[in-house]
């Protein structure tokens, strides 16, 4: 038997506290959806203790983005801040029902943030080997984020540049 390190014990403690916060849901802050499960991801970076909560699908061929949260803890494992990273849950098919018309890309919009966020990228990387689409776009008022799942590459354009490119493409057709 091996004894857990202090960091491992801290990770366990904040994860357990996050699970308790969610399932007590005293203020109705967290939202629950059918055929989904919550995944708790504790992190300690540069002394900051955080738990990300992602909503996973329990249905084959469905990728969930959204209904995700960030909980921040102090050194004594007390919750200091909780934040919704997306307002809603979006569900994307991993593969088309029609082999003649595969899904090549997916997209969603951001209201709360300007660019793609870490939970979007985490989810896309987790599912990249199970989906047929190669790119995911996140569109906000100021920016368009383009994440290439195959290359694991992110490009962020201003919305103005994106709109210019779209107009140019329209003229070419």
Give residue ranges: language-model regions.
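Surface-exposed beta-strand edges and flanking loops
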Residues: 42, 53-56, 73, 83-84, ...
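Active-site-proximal loop/helix of nucleotide/amide-processing enzymes and allied scaffolds
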Residues: 1-13, 17-20, 28-46, 91-173
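Exposed beta-strand-loop-beta-strand "reactive/processing" segments of non-cytosolic proteins
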Residues: 28-71
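Short helix-loop boundary/capping segments
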Residues: 57-60, 66-94
């Amino acid at each position: 038997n091996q004894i857990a390190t202090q960091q491992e014990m801290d990770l366990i403690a904040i994860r357990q506290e996050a699970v308790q916060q969610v399932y007590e849901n005293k203020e109705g802050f967290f939202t629950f959806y059918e055929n989904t499960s919550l995944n708790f991801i504790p992190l300690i970076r540069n002394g900051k203790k955080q738990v990300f909560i992602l909503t996973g699908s329990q249905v084959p061929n469905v990728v969930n983005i959204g209904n995700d949260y960030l909980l921040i803890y102090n050194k004594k494992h007390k919750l200091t801040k909780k934040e919704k990273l997306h307002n809603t849950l979006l569900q994307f098919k991993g593969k088309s029902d029609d082999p003649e018309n595969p899904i090549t890309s997916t997209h969603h919009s951001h209201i709360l943030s300007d660019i793609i966020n870490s939970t979007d990228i985490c989810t896309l990387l987790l599912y990249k080997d199970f989906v047929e689409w190669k790119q995911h776009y996140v569109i906000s008022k100021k920016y368009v984020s383009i994440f290439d799942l195959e290359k694991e590459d992110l490009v962020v354009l201003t919305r103005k540049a994106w709109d210019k490119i779209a107009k140019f493409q329209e003229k070419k057709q």
